[in-house]
Amino acid sequence: EKLNWIDENYLSHFEKIEVDSEVRLQKPFAERKEEYGFYSVTEGEDTEGKAYFSYNTVCGDGLDRNLYRAFPVLSYVLVQSIGAPLKQALLDAGIGNDISCYYEESVRQPFFSIIAKNVKMEQKQQFINVIETELKKIVKEGLNQQSLLAAINGYEFQYREADFGNFPKGLMYGLQIFDSWLYD
C-alpha cells in the first residue's frame, strides 16, 4: 500500500533512465610511477633514516573469487609471518627496521603494498631491487610449503570462527558481500 502511494505520488512522474555505473579497470602504467609525500616530525628532530618506502602493485580483478581468498594467504606467507621471505630479505639488506604489507581487496582493482619504515632515502633503488629479486627467486624456487600450509590453516580457522571482534557477524558478512556487489 505504501509503495503504491509512493509510486502514484512521486515515482510515476519520472522517466526511467539508464545509468552506466560500471567501474572500469584502469589501464596499466607504461612505466613505474613514483610519488613523494611528507609527514610531520617534531621541531629539530633528525630526519635521517626516517623515510617510508612503499612498493605497490595491482593484483588482478576484484571480481576474481580465487584471488580474493588466495592473496591474503600469500601476503601472510610473503611478508607477515615470522621469517617471511620478502620481509627477511629487506631486513637482511638493512632496509628499514619494520616491514609490513597491505592488501586491499574491496576495490575493483585490488592492490598489494610492501612497506618499509625508517629507511634512508638513498636506499630507494636497493628497496626495489631486493623486492623484485626475491619475488623472482620465489617464483623460481617456490614458497615454503610448511609456511603456506600454516597460512591456509590459519585463514580457514579464521573464516570458520567468523570472529570479527566487536563487530556483529551479520554486518561484517554484509560488508564483505559489497566487495563484489558494488561492481557491474
Predicted regions and their residues:
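Charge-rich, well-structured scaffold segments of protease-associated domains
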Residues: 1-36, 43-71, 76-184
